[in-house]
Amino acid sequence: MCRDEPDTMILTQIEAKEACDWLRVTGFPQYAQLYEDLLFPIDIALVKREHDFLDRDAIEALCRRLNTLNKCAVMKLEISPHRKRSEDSDEEEPCAISGKWTFQRDSKRWSRLEEFDVFSPKQDPIPGSPDNSRLQSATSRESMLTDLSEHQEVSSIRSLSSTSSSAPTHVPHSGEATTPRTNSVISVCSSSHFVGNEDSFSSLPSPKELSSFSFSMKGHEKNTKSKTRSLLKRMESLKLKGSHHSKHKAPSKLGLIISAPILQEGMDEEKLKQLNCVEISALNGNHINVPMVRKRSVSNSTQTSSSSSQSETSSAVSTPSPVTRTRSLSTCNKRVGMYLEGFDPFSQSAFNNVTEQNYKNRESYPEDTVFYIPEDHKPGTFPKALSNGSFCPSGNSSVNWRTGSFHGPGHLSLRRENSSDSPKELKRRNSSSSVSSRMSIYDNVPGSILYSSSGELADLENEDIFPELDDILYHVKGMQRIVNQWSEKFSDEGDSDSALDSVSPCPSSPKQIHLDVDHDRRTPSDLDSTGNSLNEPEEPTDIPERRDSGVGASLTRCNRHRLRWHSFQSSHRPSLNSVSLQINCQSVAQMNLLQKYSLLKLTALLEKYTPSNKHGFSWAVPKFMKRIKVPDYKDRSVFGVPLTVNVQRSGQPLPQSIQQAMRYLRNHCLDQVGLFRKSGVKSRIQALRQMNESAEDYVNYEGQSAYDVADMLKQYFRDLPEPLMTNKLSETFLQIYQYVPKDQRLQAIKAAIMLLPDENREVLQTLLYFLSHVTAAVKENQMTPTNLAVCLAPSLFHLNTLKRENSSPRVMQRKQSLGKPDQKDLNENLAATQGLAHMIAECKKLFQVPEEMSRCRNSYTEQELKPLTLEALGHLSNDQPADYRHFLQDCVDGLFKEVKEKFKGWVSYPTSEQAELSYKKVSEGPPLRLWRATIEVPAAPEEILKRLLKEQHLWDVDLLDSKVIEILDSQTEIYQYVQNSMAPHPARDYVVLRTWRTNLPRGACALLFTSVDHDRAPVAGVRVNVLLSRYLIEPCGSGKSKLTYMCRADLRGHMPEWYTKSFGHLCAAEVVKIRDSFSNQSTESKDTRSR
């Protein structure tokens, strides 16, 4: 057995590393730091008490990881310290969900705000010990880790069968010398009796059990340092032997033989009672073998409609540790390091409950519904009619609902729901195999051709599979034919060419398909919270004349025209009570905390309900934040351009022409029957694509067919380099609708949405709100959420598509049209349809802060970081008396200090704009970089300052309104301006204290402003917090000036990663627009003189 010890140690180290990574990204970084500093084991009961605001699932997910680390600490296993990120990326902002911990930025340590013993379980005084001292708790003024390093003593268990185990433990006084590095954990290092099988971790005693043991320190005559040195040498020798053995051992011809349990020497009856050992023979023949329990089916964790009470038992016995999902070991390895709360492994009732639950799950699997498809159905198209029923095997036959196969003697009955007739039985063609008629009801799904067991095509045309449907189908086809003739009469062009091979018609009746979605029947008045008409005319849109130079970046830089869609914004304006709960109103620190909580919640739900091999840690936050080389998209403007590139170019994730297409459909085409279902014309759709690529600023859709525009919109999402839900998270979205129960899907999908990148989440919100308007007109267009989902889900999830360039490994090669569709593909298509329909129906609830965040003590509300008042700004200055003028003067001095030091410490950053871009990390405040953009402008400093102060509308295309609230002096004022956002997201509201200077050395000018809280400024949108904004204008000769713009702002509703990837590009684009405003003005003046 000893030869397996190195492998076991390596696997345990991997498990500990993954547990620490999970703790960091879910808001528990303090525990990962404690483990790396060898301050484990900790008392899990006290951790539960500290996080009592979390629900049961989240607590179990946390305790599983802590229990794993406790066992690893007992085994004296260390992991490599957490590596810092590269210099060009921000370190992750320290963030803990619990409000009882604080991060000391000077020492980079976590410490507690109040005394709380978290490291050792409470225990009775040990008899014979000279002192009853316990671990001291750290306060907010000193690091807890340093405090523990000075007072905690080490104990080493060399062997559980040591003859000195009955000696009393000596707890040293606080004055006794201890070794800081080795005084952290109790280690188990048995040299000869260590069992190296895969389940050896779970047999280790817990921290509470260790407290009942007593260990001898063999007197005080032996030096502590010598003991520590010998212990480290022993550990190092074990590591060297293990690594050498793992590299050179020959493969064994015989399988690993594990003997029966061997009672160690010295294990008397008292110890057996402490370990809860039970005699197997005492079970009276009714026992259940432990290996059978470990090999049992995981069906109890995969059911999709089980109640919460039933699933609790399932999760308690079937949730593995993270590392077991990433390696392929024997089935008995699936319970390594799991946390079982209130579960007695030797309880007979526990085994009986598990067996009974598995039997119930096998007997009544909920997903036994099938859809009947007519025999003249054309593969690849939507059937004319569908009816649902269920398979009922007759006799002794059994059905495997996971794979769709069934086995048994010769007959299979098809029972129709709500049918009073006796079921008709049909003989199968072969008793050894089944032929399943599985036709897809989604576009993009190739038609399936069934094969018999011999590999030949099954002749189903001569076999009457659905005789009961003949009469019904006859009438349905006749009515469908009448509807088609009526719709063709009113269509603009009778061309039957399909624009896309994947576009297929779906039933026009809202009740014809039931895909397990609760339809939310909404009227237009329900969607419009402000009383505005959904189809109210927009303000007239003038096409501005292009004024750029026609060369360089001005040809590829987007959008001098902004779409202003006020009716769409006002129809989804939240009520006053729910404004603070909207995601787009949260600060960057709150978004960071909310993302960690969402990952915690999603992990808990997926581990509870999904099979062990269906989920993992690959979709966690650091994975999709990994920096990837992005290809160049200079030759593309709309189609095939990532959403991130759109943000960097124009400040909005959706191109203007795509937004205009959505507005055209919403204002003029909601009454078109079968919108997004009926196909457009290929030639016209191709012409629309060319119009979008050539003139992305503005595209006139007047007179275009609604079906052509809708198909073009579907093509836009299909042509994105990755799905809207991203490659990393698409599978998670599908798993939610495959395994998570209905009553918990909403909170699971809200958590998954919070893990999306900001631009993907904003586009998803815009699209879902738009589709909710389409379903509001269901009486006219007959498009329910389910019908829309059938048509759009393949495009949004990129289902059933061939692997493309730059796509992730998840997009696998799909089967060709002549092959049999894979069961996984069918399950994913069904889950995607159900998921999209559910998100359309519940779109108003998906983008709100969970109510659970209000229970995070004060850690969430404290992160709001509102702008300060004038009086509070005055207190930031060191001068007395406190006044905002002193604060402004300090800002001016800081600006010229940067100039004097020639901007030392700034890091250059690449950008596509014709400007120099750099950044500087700031340790204070929220996790936001300070960005700097520099450009040369063909104007004098005074002219540029006037353009910035009085003529913002000439260069800011997003400006909606601006006004001066209060004039404080000749060079200082309170200024408010509002910028437009992509509909239906609310506008951005700025209220700033700004001051300017013109009498600076060398003829320079400066404009400085920062956000301020002013009672006379009305709220006109989401209030932005500008922490720092500076304009420095220096003359550089020949009538030109050097414009330097520095900014650090919290725009609300964005993650720290968004500011790292996109905000700097927006700063560079702003100075380019200021320069272009002067270039265009000079060009116009020359044209006027030439005339």
UniProtKB/Swiss-Prot annotation:
Q: Does the keyword Cytoplasm apply?
A: yes
Q: Where is the START domain?
A: 877-1084
Record region (Polybasic cluster (PBR)): 614-636
The impact of changing R677E is: Loss of activity
Q: Which Gene3D superfamilies match?
A: 1.10.287.2070, 3.30.530.20, Rho GTPase activation protein (1.10.555.10)
Q: What is the protein name stated in its UniProt record?
A: Rho GTPase-activating protein 7
- Lyase as a keyword of this entry, yes or no, is no
Q: Which PANTHER family match?
A: RHO GTPASE-ACTIVATING PROTEIN 7, RHO-TYPE GTPASE ACTIVATING PROTEIN
Give the GO terms filed under biological process for this record.
actin cytoskeleton organization; cellular response to insulin stimulus; focal adhesion assembly; forebrain development; heart morphogenesis; hindbrain morphogenesis; intracellular signal transduction; negative regulation of cell migration
Q: Which residues carry this modification: Phosphoserine?
A: S86, S89, S129, S321
Comp. bias intervals (Basic and acidic residues): 414-425, 513-525
The species this protein was found in? Rattus norvegicus
Which InterPro entries does this entry report, sorted A to Z? Rho_GTPase_activation_prot, RhoGAP_dom, SAM, SAM/pointed_sf, START-like_dom_sf, START_lipid-bd_dom
Q: Which GO terms describe its cellular component?
A: actin filament; caveola; cortical actin cytoskeleton; cytoplasm; cytosol; focal adhesion; membrane raft; nucleus
Regions of compositional bias (Polar residues) in chain numbering: 130-143, 499-511, 526-535
